Amino acid sequence: MPGHLQEGFGCVVTNRFDQLFDDESDPFEVLKAAENKKKEAGGGGVGGPGAKSAAQAAAQTNSNAAGKQLRKESQKDRKNPLPPSVGVADKKEETQPPVALKKEGIRRVGRRPDQQLQGDGKIIDRRPERRPPRERRFEKPLEEKGEGGEFSVDRPIIERPIRGRGGLGRGRGGRGRGMGRGDGFDSRGKREFDRHSGSDRSSFSHYSGLKHEDKRGGSGSHNWGTVKDELTESPKYIQKQISYNCSDLEQSNVTEETPEGEEHPVADTENKENEVEEVKEEGPKEMTLDEWKAIQNKDRAKVEFNIRKPNEGADGQWKKGFVLHKSKSEEAHAEDSVMDHHFRKPANDITSQLEINFGDLGRPGRGGRGGRGGRGRGGRPNRGSRTDKSSASAPDVDDPEAFPALA
């Protein structure tokens, strides 16, 4: 019973309208099959209310099992009804003693959806009968997309890859998320496209009709013109070659057709003259040194100098000129003026009143910093006494008697 409850619960969740015109089989044919079974059972001479009730119960179970099986299969192909030939074949097979595939049917849909088990456990390969609805699914995209989208529909059914258990990725117990099934369909009816947007590569290039083409639209990066440009350029090149070849052939034919004594010698003389001129031009030019110098002098620009003799054409205004010599007195006066300029002092100069000591310029801060009495190093301020000694011995700069050698 839990299996029945789970199945009923699953039908309600997946499709609430599951029981509205979901059976593809004709109920009248199911009833006819049940009546035939009744007749066969009653033909043996067994007739009674018990036999009739048993036959009715068997017919109901058969119809319920067939309805459930068709519900599971029709959820994928509801929009694409089967052709009449396929429907008749399915109905004939359904009249055989069916088996209600509850749990095993759910499990085996992922393994081999193209195979089913009969009551004796034999595997029936119904793949060629289920193919037509899938081919009809491809017909609409082909008509809508036109030339742009092409899918491989013309390939026969036998050449398609076998969708075995686990296959390339999506089957039960397979290798995880692989390349999906070969024909681009999942076990749940979901389709996996071979090519995604923005990619030129297709996973099944030898199956699909998509062809990889370079970006040659003439715009954007990595575009080198269009295919039409090559088609338009190539005939010109071929025509030029053909025209050149034709002209060569015509010349050869003319030379062959002309007799030996008429125009042939004229052409030979012209060819000889051209050959002689070419040979002369190709040879190196030889000349003597004098000829080469003459050519160089012609090309060289001549420089003209205004050469004249001494006192020739001299200007008369410069005749009275004489040379000036510097006197020694002027040089001494210039030296005195320079010294006065450096040592002359204004009346309000106070530099003589300032005390300038040149004692210890190398270490000026040692004496003043000598306190540090708090740390017990108070003996260092005595170094400041050097400045007093140096100040006492320093000469007075303004006193001329302190520098007798300069007097």
Curated annotation (Swiss-Prot):
Q: Where is the composition biased (Low complexity)?
A: 51-68
**Residues the record lists as N6-acetyllysine modifications:** K52, K68, K122, K140, K211, K328
The principal location of this protein is: cytoplasm
Could you name the Gene Ontology cellular component terms for this entry? cytoplasm; nucleus; perinuclear region of cytoplasm
Protein name listed in UniProt:
SERPINE1 mRNA-binding protein 1
Quaternary structure note:
Associates with mature 80S ribosomes. Interacts with EEF2/eEF2; interaction sequesters EEF2/eEF2 at the A-site of the ribosome, thereby blocking the interaction sites of the mRNA-tRNA complex, promoting ribosome stabilization and hibernation. Interacts with SPIN1. Interacts with CHD3 and TDRD3. Interacts with ZDHHC17 (via ANK repeats).
InterPro entries from the UniProt entry: HABP4/SERBP1-like, HABP4_PAIRBP1-bd, IHABP4_N
Q: Where in the cell is it found?
A: Cytoplasm; Nucleus; Cytoplasm, Perinuclear region
Function statement:
Ribosome-binding protein that promotes ribosome hibernation, a process during which ribosomes are stabilized in an inactive state and preserved from proteasomal degradation. Acts via its association with EEF2/eEF2 factor, sequestering EEF2/eEF2 at the A-site of the ribosome and promoting ribosome stabilization and storage in an inactive state. May also play a role in the regulation of mRNA stability: binds to the 3'-most 134 nt of the SERPINE1/PAI1 mRNA, a region which confers cyclic nucleotide regulation of message decay. Seems to play a role in PML-nuclear bodies formation.
- Per the UniProt entry, the disulfide pairs are none
* Organism in which the protein naturally occurs: Rattus norvegicus (Rat)
Fill in the PTM field for this protein: Phosphorylation by MTOR inhibits SERBP1 and relieves ribosome hibernation.
- Gene Ontology annotations of biological process type: negative regulation of translation; PML body organization; regulation of apoptotic process; ribosome hibernation
